Amino acid sequence: MFLFEDLNVESAQAVKAEESPAQTVQSKEEQVPANSTDKVLVTHTKLLDVGAFNGVAKRKWNPKMKHYIIPRNAAQFSAQFDLINSDLLNLKLHEAFNYLTEAAKAKKNILFVGTKSKAVQELIQSIAERTNSFYINQRWLGGTLTNFKTISNSINQLKRLIHTRDNDLTKYTKKEQIMIMKKLAKLERFFGGIKDMQGLPHVLVIDDPIKEKNAVTEARKLRIPVIALCNTNSDPNVITLPIPANNYNIRSVTLLLNLLGDAVALAQGNPAKFAFKPDEEIDIPQLVKKETRTVVNRDRAGFNKKQPKAEEAAKPAEKKAEK
């Protein structure tokens, strides 16, 4: 695993497998940001409320995450899913917070990546926009990092189409305008979040390294640091700074990614959304699923069958009477 080379941050070193949780927690105070002497980045109660410590089903776990999981022989370990060590979650969260703070102060390119669901896509975009960062929330296109020159050509095409839309669109025919707008919409969907990024990103922030494995692979090839929320089925060894946490629950992802975004916002002199705030000021609503509606085939159910008129129904009876 490579180290953070751009910034001299000791906390960027990966956790070694032989390191015990007790040894790791001893250095926890060193990782707390300087501005958090009077306040806590986020309380244990709030992390528990959003389910940040809940892992996946035990049968799906990755043995490489063993270091971050509460021992299976613990008395409280009776659930069907693994439980994440709360001290290690807090420790790695502070490390990531510190690193992003330094990266933002150094004017580094920070790229947020998340494509798993519509809720995650909207979350990634909102965090990037409020922190003046970059984002990719649609399907990761192969070569986004490793073939950035070709991607840059598409970005330049997007910028030209935006200029055309805003200035010269009226000189084209109606059909040409429709084609231009369709092309613009497609490019905007894939490259809108990175169209102003000058060069490669200096760090990636990812919600799910399994879903975004292509992004992780390309970043590793180019030795770009990756910060990611790693559930108990992830491989932390491929991530520069893994944060052991529940990345399946949208409330957990919303809290943790916004905290990482707050590191960037505070470094820029902007207000934080969740960081260092009391629990009552952190409102993360439950995602309400739409009720499933049962579609009835009215033809099969007999609702749309034409009923015979009274006169037509009487004719067969009259014929029988004549006979």
From Swiss-Prot:
GO molecular function: structural constituent of ribosome
PROSITE patterns per the UniProt record, alphabetical: RIBOSOMAL_S2_2 (PS00963)
The entry's keywords: Ribonucleoprotein, Ribosomal protein
SUPFAM superfamilies linked to this entry: Ribosomal protein S2
Superkingdom classification of source: Bacteria
Any one Gene Ontology BP term: translation
Protein name stated in the entry: Small ribosomal subunit protein uS2
Ranges for region Disordered: 295-323
InterPro entries: Ribosomal_uS2, Ribosomal_uS2_bac/mit/plastid, Ribosomal_uS2_CS, Ribosomal_uS2_flav_dom_sf
Family: Belongs to the universal ribosomal protein uS2 family.
GO cellular component, one term: cytosolic small ribosomal subunit
